């Protein structure tokens, strides 16, 4: 088995604890750094050197399915796909087949300064875009000149995609062959994104220009920080004890009410032609069982993929987690084409240039479509030949 990051470090203890209850097949775990894992999977496939089982980033599933590296989840294992969040399962569904089993989940919510919102008359950030922006203006006035309301680094695409998903924008057409950035829903989201910078609510800065996110959050340089569940631990360890009652989490806003976000996390796949596939699915079943999900959450802090696990373990007792549970129920899958990571990188390059005055909103949307269409050229040919998933 190949595994990455914190999960790879936790696997020996996780497997040992699971084995104590119900013996599992012997599993040899090879840890991979996240930065090298995607390339390792592709070269492993090309060289016929893949393992039986692997953890994969959810955004890689479409590519691995397209090249024939992974097997669909067999009917006999369909029970592993029950009790899961719909949007996460949808991320694993390509061409009417499900190719991976979600292992743990994440998404992005707002980390906000509870004390500063209370000072301006809000218990939490409002759920509608217009009201939310009005609240940000009040918070910005309260923190004074030189400070902002929200941090949305211009080199990070997740902030724009969150707004786009909240506006129900597709970004890629239904066939996955052309960009849909010029569609009204995305243009509205892009215009709203731009307004946050134009109105001085967000600094025009990349992540590398913020020297210490935690210090800046504590001193009020920004009061809203959209991020994932890993930030809970960072807030608890990097902010002083006396500051712990001054921050909270809230779901994302949307145009007319609660917004959306992309479902993230990792899934487990079994590779095509693996000799020990049946045993591998047994391991997947153990990792997705109630005990496996609880142990993984305790060892890594990851949010369980199985919904029932949220009510039976520490995730249920953590008040900061509630916003993530709410957000996962309204999450929407990102486009599932192998080229998506390159497309979304180009999207953000254009978005940053728009913020710096090179494009209007409509010009930026058209440029995004142009770049997406160029990247999707091969896919259009494959669809025309009936060769895509």
List each model region and its residues.
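Extracytoplasmic "Venus flytrap"/periplasmic binding protein-like
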Residues: 16-86, 91-93, 118-127, 216, ...
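Hinge/lid segment of periplasmic solute-binding proteins
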Residues: 58-109, 133, 161, 244-253, ...
């Amino acid at each position: 088995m190949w595994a990455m990051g914190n999960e790879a470090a936790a696997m020996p203890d996780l497997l040992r604890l699971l084995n104590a209850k119900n013996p599992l097949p012997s599993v040899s775990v090879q840890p991979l750094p996240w930065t090298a894992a995607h390339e390792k999977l592709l070269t492993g496939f090309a060289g016929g050197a893949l393992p039986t089982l692997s953890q994969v980033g959810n955004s890689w599933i479409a590519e691995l399915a397209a090249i024939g590296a992974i097997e669909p989840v067999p009917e006999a294992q369909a029970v592993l796909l029950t009790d899961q969040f719909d949007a996460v399962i949808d991320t694993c569904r390509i061409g009417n087949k499900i190719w991976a089993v979600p292992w743990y989940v994440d998404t992005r919510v707002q980390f906000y300064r509870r004390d500063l919102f209370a000072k301006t008359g809000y218990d939490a950030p409002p759920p509608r875009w217009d009201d939310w922006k009005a609240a940000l203006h009040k918070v910005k006035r309260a923190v004074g000149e030189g400070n902002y309301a929200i941090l949305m680094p211009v080199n990070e695409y997740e902030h724009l995609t969150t707004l786009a998903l909240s506006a129900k924008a597709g970004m890629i057409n239904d066939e996955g062959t052309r960009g849909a950035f010029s569609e009204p829903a995305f243009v509205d989201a892009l215009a709203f994104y731009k307004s946050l910078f134009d109105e001085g609510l967000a600094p025009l800065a990349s992540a590398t220009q913020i020297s210490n996110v935690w210090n800046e959050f504590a001193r009020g340089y920004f009061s809203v920080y959209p991020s994932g569940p890993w930030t809970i631990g960072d807030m608890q360890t990097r902010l002083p004890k006396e500051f712990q009652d001054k921050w909270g989490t809230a779901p994302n806003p949307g145009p007319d009410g609660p917004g959306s976000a992309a479902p993230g996390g990792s899934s487990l796949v079994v590779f095509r032609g693996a000799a020990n596939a049946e045993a591998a699915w047994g391991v997947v079943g153990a990792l997705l069982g109630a005990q496996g999900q609880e142990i993984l959450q305790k060892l890594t802090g990851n949010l369980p993929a199985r919904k029932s696990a949220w009510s039976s373990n520490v995730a249920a007792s953590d008040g900061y987690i509630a916003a993530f549970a709410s957000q996962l129920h309204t999450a929407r899958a990102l486009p599932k084409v192998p080229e998506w990571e390159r497309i979304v990188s180009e999207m953000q390059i254009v978005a940053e240039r728009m913020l710096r005055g090179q494009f209007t909103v409509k010009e930026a949307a058209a440029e995004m479509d142009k770049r997406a269409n160029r990247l999707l050229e091969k896919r259009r040919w494959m669809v025309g030949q009936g060769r895509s998933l």
